[in-house]
């Protein structure tokens, strides 16, 4: 599993000109599920993200979690995160888990975050989406599990 975590002031995802997900301060998560991932990996990723302290405290240190700042989550599935670019010029996506299992695991991931008390908005699995955001920092982390 690979998750790109972007600290944002706000973010939204549109499909066919209609907003389907919209958050204020929080995390934009771009989520890639790979072959071999299972519920234990999903739970570990959700737990790590829930506890990640990348918001600044009153002293300017990255010491606060998403929960500490009452942040929200926008989760967007993105199989292209699993691209292999080692050979040639065309990325290979054989590492990416195929639907419907990848969709189920992405939905389970979002439920885990909701169960941790977060407001979670999502894109639509497999759709052509337009994602807009205002980075805060920018502060971006790639979580590989």
UniProtKB/Swiss-Prot annotation:
Database matches in InterPro entries: Daa-tRNA_deacyls_DTD, DTD-like_sf
Catalysis performed (reactions): glycyl-tRNA(Ala) + H2O = tRNA(Ala) + glycine + H(+); a D-aminoacyl-tRNA + H2O = a tRNA + a D-alpha-amino acid + H(+)
Lineage top rank: taxon: Bacteria
Span(s) of short sequence motif Gly-cisPro motif, important for rejection of L-amino acids: 137-138
Keyword Hydrolase tagged: yes
Statement: the UniProt record of this protein carries the keyword Transport: no
Domain remark text: A Gly-cisPro motif from one monomer fits into the active site of the other monomer to allow specific chiral rejection of L-amino acids.
Protein name, as recorded: D-aminoacyl-tRNA deacylase
Species for this entry: Lactobacillus acidophilus (strain ATCC 700396 / NCK56 / N2 / NCFM)
